[in-house]
Design a protein with these regions (language model features):
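Charged DNA-binding/catalytic regions of mobile-element recombinases
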Residues: 1-246
Length: 246
């Protein structure tokens, strides 16, 4: 019986190949749910249980998320804005509500910081800056990039935590000059900016943990590549299998 089974062709051979290609193409960043969505986008008719079973049998396991957040809050040093966003993470129009934050990496013995700005409508990263110091100029630069790229209409909103960069007059002035509204999370409440925290979790799992970067320049290039991939290729379940740019 077992000899006969071994001689029979594998009825899932083509599906296994498609699964492996999806997994490899996306640099081991996809678990079975996103592989399933990718396959369905290609025209495969298959259920999640089979994809899960085959990926386990093939030893294909996505990278595991690790969390160790950078904390920019150092107390109330200036102005604390109201939590105007109030966890309304699903605006009905593009270029109306943005979120931002800072996260920290260790690269070639140095601390490196990333400041992205996300449009909550499609969860795309519309601007980002990388620096070796989490300064006010560094965070303001990413917001200035976002304003230039998106040209939001008066009344747009930017939400952050209570980090010192966002209490600073330079950040507040930039918002008011472009007729925006500042919103801040409540003290110590990461869930008020959960979408950006979630992005950081995916980014660190999918392009940072387990990788080695010899220089900050090499790391910067990897960040640029990841954000391009995230915006144009990475499938999102909340977007029903589409990418932010689709």
């Amino acid at each position: 019986y077992h000899q006969k089974r071994l001689r029979e062709p594998d009825k899932h051979a083509a599906l296994k190949q498609a699964i492996r290609e999806s997994f490899e193409r996306n640099k081991h960043r996809y678990g079975y749910r996103r592989v399933l969505l990718d396959l369905r986008n290609q025209g495969w008719v298959v259920n999640h249980k089979l994809v899960y079973k085959l990926m386990r049998a093939m030893g294909l396991k996505a990278k595991i998320r690790q969390r160790r957040p950078y904390i920019s809050y150092t107390g109330t040093i200036s102005y604390i804005a109201e939590n105007t966003l109030e966890r309304n993470f699903t605006p009905d129009r593009l270029n109306t509500v943005f979120v931002s934050d800072v996260t920290e990496f260790k690269v070639a013995g140095r601390k490196v910081y990333l400041s992205p700005v996300m449009d909550l409508f499609d969860r795309s990263i519309v601007a980002h800056t990388v620096a070796t110091s989490p300064s006010t100029a560094f965070t303001s630069a990413s917001l200035a990039q976002a304003i230039k790229a998106c040209a939001p209409e008066p009344g747009w909103m930017i939400h952050t935590d209570q980090g010192f960069q966002y209490q600073h007059s330079s950040w507040r002035t930039l918002i008011s000059q472009h007729q925006g509204v500042q919103s801040m999370s409540r003290k110590g409440n990461c869930y008020d900016n959960a979408v950006m925290e979630n992005f950081f979790g995916h980014l660190k799992t999918e392009m940072y943990h387990g990788e080695a970067f010899d220089t900050v320049a090499e790391f910067n290039q990897a960040i640029d590549e990841y954000i391009r991939w995230y915006n144009t290729e990475r499938i999102q379940q909340r977007l029903k299998g589409l990418t932010p740019m689709q």
